[in-house]
Design a protein with these regions (language model features):
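Extreme N-terminal starter segment of soluble prokaryotic enzymes
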Residues: 1-3
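C-terminal substrate-binding/catalytic lobe of Rossmann-fold NAD(P)-dependent dehydrogenases
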Residues: 133-139, 148-308
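Rossmann-like NAD(P)-binding element
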Residues: 51-114
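Conserved N-terminal Rossmann-fold NAD(P) cofactor-binding segment
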Residues: 33-71, 300-307
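N-terminal Rossmann-fold NAD(P) dinucleotide-binding loop
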Residues: 12-13
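Rossmann-like NAD(P)(H) cofactor-binding subdomain of soluble oxidoreductases
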Residues: 87-153
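Glycine-rich Rossmann-fold phosphate-binding loop(s) that bind the pyrophosphate
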Residues: 8-9
Length: 308
C-alpha cells in the first residue's frame, strides 16, 4: 500500500506521521514545492521509526511527481493555511489553482488512485477535483466531516464530563463555520441521547463551540490546526487501505441524496478499498434537514465563485 501526501506543512507532516505509526502502509511519499522541505520532514519522521515501532518507509521529494507513481491513495493538503480572522472561503482563489494542478499531476502518475482532499475551502476544492478530473465519484473524498465530528465529540465529552470513548456524535454539512450541522438529536452517551444529560442551552453551546472549533484554534495558534486534521485524514486512509468499511462523514458528490444535486458536502459514507462504497441517507428531523439544505446553499455559492 503506497500513500502520497502532497504538502509537507504541518497538516501533511502530521498525516504522514499518523499513517506511518499505524503501520498499515508500506510506503508514504511526501511531496512539496519547497526545496528540501519534504526530504527533511521524511528524514525526521524516519528517525522515529525505531522509537515508534513502525516499518513504513517515508520518502520526501521536491515536486518530483514520478516518485508518487502507482500510489493507491493520494492526499492533497497543499495550499495556503488560514490566518487568524480568515474564513476558509477566502482561500479559494489561490488554493483552487494549486489543487487543480496537483490533482492532474497525481492522476498522470497514478491513474487509479483514490484522492482525499484536505485543502480549503474543502467542499469546493473536492467539487473542483470532480469537475476537472472526470474520474469516478467514489474515488474523490473530502476530509472535513471526520475532523468536525471529532471536535464535536470532544465538546460533548467536555460538557458531559464523560470519557470521550463513551460519546458518539456526527457533524454533516459544509466544512465551514456557518455550514456545519452538528447532529445534536442523534448524539449519544453509551447509546443514551445526550439530551437526557444536558440542557438545551448547554447543547446550543456545544453546537456553537463545535462550529467555530477551527477558528478558535487558528486564533490561538496563529495558523491552522494540524494534529486533529492529520489524525482525521489518517483514519480515512486506513479505512480505505485496510477495507475496514467504517462510517465517516466526508464530503461526497451527491446525486439526489438528501434532496441535493451536483455538489460536494459532508454526509456519512462507508469507506473501503474502492473509496466511497456507499452514501448513507440518515432519517433527519426537519430542523437538521433544513440546516443541511441551508449549508448546501452556502457551498453552492462558494462553488459559483469559481464558475463551477
Amino acid at each position: 500500500m503506497k500513500v502520497t501526501v502532497v504538502g509537507a506543512g504541518a497538516v501533511g507532516a502530521s498525516c504522514a506521521e499518523y499513517i506511518a505509526i499505524k503501520n498499515f502502509a508500506s510506503q508514504v511519499v511526501i511531496l512539496d514545492i519547497k526545496d528540501g522541505f519534504a526530504e527533511g520532514k521524511a528524514m525526521d519522521l524516519m528517525q522515529t521509526a525505531s522509537l515508534n515501532n513502525f516499518d513504513t518507509k517515508i520518502v520526501g521529494t521536491t515536486n518530483d511527481y514520478s516518485k508518487t507513481a502507482d500510489s493507491d491513495i493520494c492526499v492533497i493538503t497543499s495550499g495556503i493555511p488560514r490566518k487568524p480572522g480568515m474564513t476558509r472561503e477566502e482561500l479559494i482563489g489561490i488554493n483552487a489553482g494549486i489543487v487543480k494542478e496537483v490533482s492532474a499531476k497525481l492522476l498522470e502518475k497514478s491513474p487509479n488512485t483514490i484522492i482525499i482532499v484536505v485543502s480549503n475551502p474543502m467542499d469546493t476544492m473536492t467539487y473542483l477535483v470532480h469537475k476537472t478530473t472526470g474520474i469516478q465519484k467514489n474515488r474523490i473524498i473530502g476530509m472535513g466531516g471526520a475532523l468536525d465530528s471529532a471536535r464535536f465529540k470532544y465538546r460533548l465529552a467536555e460538557a458531559l464530563d464523560a470519557p470521550i470513548s463513551d460519546v458518539d456524535g456526527m457533524v454533516i454539512g459544509g466544512h465551514s463555520d456557518k455550514g456545519m450541522v452538528p447532529l445534536i438529536s442523534k448524539a449519544t452517551r453509551n447509546s443514551i441521547k445526550v439530551s437526557n444529560f444536558l440542557s438545551a442551552e448547554r447543547l446550543d453551546k456545544v453546537r456553537e463551540d463545535t462550529k467555530v472549533g477551527g477558528a478558535t484554534l487558528t486564533k490561538l495558534l496563529g495558523t491552522s490546526a494540524w494534529y486533529a486534521p492529520g489524525a482525521a485524514v489518517s483514519s480515512l486512509v486506513q479505512s480505505i487501505a485496510c477495507n475496514h468499511m467504517k462510517i465517516f462523514p466526508c464530503s461526497a458528490l451527491l446525486d439526489g441524496e438528501y434532496g441535493l444535486h451536483d455538489l460536494c458536502i459532508g454526509v456519512p459514507v462507508i469507506l473501503g478499498r474502492n473509496g466511497i462504497e456507499k452514501i448513507i441517507e440518515l432519517d433527519l428531523d426537519s430542523a437538521d434537514l433544513n440546516h443541511l439544505t441551508e449549508s448546501a446553499e452556502g457551498v453552492s455559492k462558494t462553488n459559483s465563485l469559481l464558475g463551477l
